[in-house]
């Protein structure tokens, strides 16, 4: 299908590594002179930080110990779907920013833990780029996945995902190990029901697998490095993918299934550049013909 206003969505749980993938896309956009409009998934949370704490306390008092940022109740799924639909049809839409810390507060002019006002996406963009929790979400009321032309899943094995979240939340956000563990436990039902199913909707999944012991992520002192990892890359539709070329260009890579290639963790950026650049250029070419 020819789309005049293509959409790319990057989906992953908290601590999955979607921000690193976003940086690779930004490098490709810069090199290929692609102008992207950006949406951050946090912008479509329903509550700011103080409101979420209040709602969590209220739900806890009612006996609900699993009220989390992953669920439809705490996110603006209909509004997110609306922006995807609007951009796909007209190249326009509204978004905002969720301000996490003092540095972002200085940039956007609102206190940490709050949202900026809604504002229009930039004019004259080549495509829309979403990065967050729900870029391919499908429920009985919304279907965000249907509007994205290229859907990427970032899905480390679960223990590695937890290690990354623990380290990020402790070091960058000042939380204790106990607090992060409580968050992981509280989110688990919504993780199973609303995060995992998205990775059956994605076109490509990047799954990092550590080659060191991560049996107890809650006591791990270090995040396994790329040199201590392999990455499984699964393509939903491998038609048109030149696997022999990829195998020749990525040292020590191999195919584990007809639609899956395994690479050394240190070669992830190279693999993403080789796989994603042609797909992005295809979207731009179709845009020009639409």
From Swiss-Prot:
ATP binds at residues 12-20. Keywords: ATP-binding, Calvin cycle, Kinase, Nucleotide-binding, Photosynthesis, Transferase. The lineage of its organism: Bacteria, Pseudomonadati, Pseudomonadota, Alphaproteobacteria, Hyphomicrobiales. The gene is cbbP. Its EC number is 2.7.1.19. Signal peptide: none annotated. InterPro entries: P-loop_NTPase, PRK, PRK/URK. Disulfide bonds: none annotated. It comes from the Bacteria. One of its GO terms (biological process) is reductive pentose-phosphate cycle. Belongs to the phosphoribulokinase family. It catalyses: D-ribulose 5-phosphate + ATP = D-ribulose 1,5-bisphosphate + ADP + H(+). This is Phosphoribulokinase. It comes from Nitrobacter vulgaris. Pfam families: PRK (PF00485). GO terms for molecular function: ATP binding; phosphoribulokinase activity. Pathway: Carbohydrate biosynthesis; Calvin cycle. The keyword Transferase applies.
């Amino acid at each position: 299908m020819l789309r005049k206003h293509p959409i790319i969505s990057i989906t992953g749980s908290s601590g999955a590594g979607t921000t690193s993938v976003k940086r690779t896309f930004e490098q490709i956009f810069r090199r290929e002179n692609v102008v992207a409009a950006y949406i951050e998934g946090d912008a479509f949370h329903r509550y700011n930080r103080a409101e979420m704490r209040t709602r969590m306390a209220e739900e806890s008092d009612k006996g609900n110990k699993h009220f989390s940022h992953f669920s439809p109740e705490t996110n603006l799924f209909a509004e997110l779907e609306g922006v995807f639909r609007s951009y796909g049809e007209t190249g326009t839409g509204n978004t905002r920013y969720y301000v996490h810390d003092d540095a972002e507060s200085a940039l956007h002019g609102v206190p940490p833990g709050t949202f900026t006002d809604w504002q229009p996406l930039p004019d004259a963009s080549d495509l829309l780029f979403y990065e967050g929790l729900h870029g391919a979400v499908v429920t009985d009321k919304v279907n965000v996945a249907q509007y994205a032309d290229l859907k990427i899943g970032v899905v480390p094995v679960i223990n590695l995902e937890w290690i990354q979240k623990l380290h990020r939340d402790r070091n960058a956000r000042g939380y204790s190990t106990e607090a992060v563990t409580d968050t992981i436990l509280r989110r688990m039902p919504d993780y199973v029901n609303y995060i995992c199913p998205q990775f059956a909707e994605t076109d490509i999944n990047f799954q990092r697998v550590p080659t060191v012991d991560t049996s107890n992520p809650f006591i791990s002192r270090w995040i396994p490095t790329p040199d201590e990892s392999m990455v499984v890359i699964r393509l939903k539709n491998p038609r048109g993918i030149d696997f022999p070329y990829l195998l020749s260009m990525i040292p020590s890579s191999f195919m584990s299934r007809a639609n899956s290639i395994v690479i050394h963790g240190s070669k992830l950026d190279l693999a993403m550049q080789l796989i994603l650049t042609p797909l992005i250029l295809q979207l731009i070419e179709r845009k020009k013909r639409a």
